[in-house]
Amino acid sequence: MHCPFCRHADTQVVDSRVSEDGATIRRRRRCPACDKRFTTYERVELALPSVVKKDGSRTEFDRRKIVASMQLALRKRPVAADAIDAAVARIEYLLLGSGEREVRSERLGELVMNELRALDTIAYVRFASVYRRFEDVSEFEDVIEEFRRASSPPKPSRKR
């Protein structure tokens, strides 16, 4: 690696450490020509699929957009930032695992809704109301009824 100070072609690694999350390697380097030290970070470059919007246009996957939309839905809700990061990481993992080069925005929205459903029901309803473009109260009621059915315990069978 070139020295950022004198542009010498070869530098020496003095120390390497793996970050706490295991996703990054921090390296301290020294230039033998000018004797200056600097730090580099090494991480895996992930090739996430492009997002195909409803109008057919394509854009790069942007983790920040997913985080921002989840934060908006979770505003003033008791959900930690770490939980949001973990949810987005699960979405990225699913997208990477699919092997697809493109993902439709509708599919991405469904993945976000699934994560929000597990994190906070209020946030899920907020996101769904915008994402699915609710037009009246009955659509809210349908989603709430769906939650009630899913969360009610099964009735015990009677054996004789």
Swiss-Prot record:
Its cofactor is Zn(2+). The keyword DNA-binding applies. One of its GO terms (biological process) is negative regulation of DNA-templated transcription. It comes from the Bacteria. GO terms for molecular function: ATP binding; DNA binding; zinc ion binding. It holds the Pfam family Zn_ribbon_NrdR. Binds 1 zinc ion. This is Transcriptional repressor NrdR. Transmembrane segments: none annotated. A zinc finger (unnamed) spans 3-34. Keywords: ATP-binding, DNA-binding, Metal-binding, Nucleotide-binding, Repressor, Transcription, Transcription regulation, Zinc, Zinc-finger. Negatively regulates transcription of bacterial ribonucleotide reductase nrd genes and operons by binding to NrdR-boxes. Residues 49-139 form the ATP-cone domain. Belongs to the NrdR family. The keyword Cell wall biogenesis/degradation does not apply.
